[in-house]
């Protein structure tokens, strides 16, 4: 289920639009998650990963950054990640068309609060079970969800570390992993060549032995 949607300007973390669903039955305090989202916006910068999932216990934040604007959604952790990012891409496309040119000029929080109407309509589309099945069958080219950076929201906020630093660490780990695979491949090739050389030496010695003793 989609519980909270927020849109903010990356340059200064200014909230541009939002839509929150009160969930009285389960007693969830979405104000806490909204506060975490605002803290997250203030940590974003131009070097932050453009696609990210932040785990928050039974919930998960997903966000995308396009043209200096961050689109963030809070979902139950079990909500399909692919649908969450498809939902964000849908919002991004419409918001950019309606308000994209005005984003750099506004100074008042929630200047585009009227965009909530579109958010609510789109959210219903992605929550409806039949619509979700149809959307799930579409071969979208949004991104490979397996490659999206995943972190923990509490660690990110408490550590006081910019998401760009986390992204840098993720890239370093990826580089180290790639180097390890290359080194392993090189060692395997050397081992194979050594075995072939040993076999060649054996046959050469055998030929020399036969020629020397039998001819």
Curated annotation (Swiss-Prot):
Annotated ranges, domain Longin: 6-119
Membrane topology listed for this record: Single-pass type IV membrane protein
GO biological process, alphabetically ordered: endoplasmic reticulum to Golgi vesicle-mediated transport; negative regulation of autophagosome assembly; positive regulation of protein catabolic process; protein transport; retrograde vesicle-mediated transport, Golgi to endoplasmic reticulum; vesicle fusion with Golgi apparatus
Alphabetized InterPro entries for the sequence: Longin-like_dom_sf, Longin_dom, Sec22, Synaptobrevin-like, V_SNARE_CC
Annotated Gene Ontology cellular component terms: endoplasmic reticulum membrane; endoplasmic reticulum-Golgi intermediate compartment membrane; ER to Golgi transport vesicle membrane; Golgi membrane; melanosome; SNARE complex
One protein family per Pfam: Longin
SMART domains from the UniProt entry: Longin (SM01270)
One GO MF term attached to the UniProt entry: SNAP receptor activity
Cytoplasmic side, ranges: 1-194
Keywords recorded for this protein, A-Z: Coiled coil, Endoplasmic reticulum, ER-Golgi transport, Golgi apparatus, Membrane, Protein transport, Transmembrane, Transmembrane helix, Transport
Chain segments annotated as transmembrane: 195-215
Subcellular location field: Endoplasmic reticulum membrane; Endoplasmic reticulum-Golgi intermediate compartment membrane; Golgi apparatus, cis-Golgi network membrane; Golgi apparatus, trans-Golgi network membrane
Domain v-SNARE coiled-coil homology span(s) in chain numbering: 134-194
SUPFAM superfamilies named among the record's database cross-references: SNARE fusion complex (SSF58038), SNARE-like (SSF64356)
Keyword Transcription in record: no
Similarity comment text for this entry: Belongs to the synaptobrevin family.
The protein's role, per its UniProt record: SNARE involved in targeting and fusion of ER-derived transport vesicles with the Golgi complex as well as Golgi-derived retrograde transport vesicles with the ER.
Subunit-level organization: Component of 2 distinct SNARE complexes.
Record-given protein name: Vesicle-trafficking protein SEC22b
Record organism: Gallus gallus (Chicken)
Gene coding for it: SEC22B
């Amino acid at each position: 289920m989609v519980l909270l949607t927020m849109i903010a300007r990356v340059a200064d973390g200014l909230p541009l639009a939002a839509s929150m669903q009160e969930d009285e039955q389960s007693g969830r305090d979405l104000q806490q998650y909204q506060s975490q989202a605002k803290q997250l916006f203030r940590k974003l910068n131009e070097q932050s990963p453009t696609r990210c999932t932040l785990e928050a216990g039974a919930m998960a934040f997903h966000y995308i950054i396009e043209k200096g604007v961050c689109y963030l959604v809070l979902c139950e952790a079990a909500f399909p990640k692919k649908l969450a990012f498809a939902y964000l891409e849908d919002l991004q496309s419409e918001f950019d068309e309606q308000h994209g040119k005005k984003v750099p000029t506004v100074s008042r929080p929630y200047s585009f609060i009227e965009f909530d109407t579109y958010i609510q309509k789109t959210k219903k589309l992605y929550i409806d079970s039949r619509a979700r099945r149809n959307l799930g069958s579409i071969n979208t080219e949004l991104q490979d969800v397996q490659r999206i950076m995943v972190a923990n929201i509490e660690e990110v906020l408490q550590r006081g570390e910019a998401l760009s630093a986390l992204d840098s660490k993720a890239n370093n780990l990826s580089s180290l992993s790639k180097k390890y695979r290359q080194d392993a491949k090189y060692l395997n090739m050397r081992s194979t060549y050594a075995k072939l050389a040993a076999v060649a030496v054996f046959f050469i010695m055998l030929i020399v032995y036969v020629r020397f003793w039998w001819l």
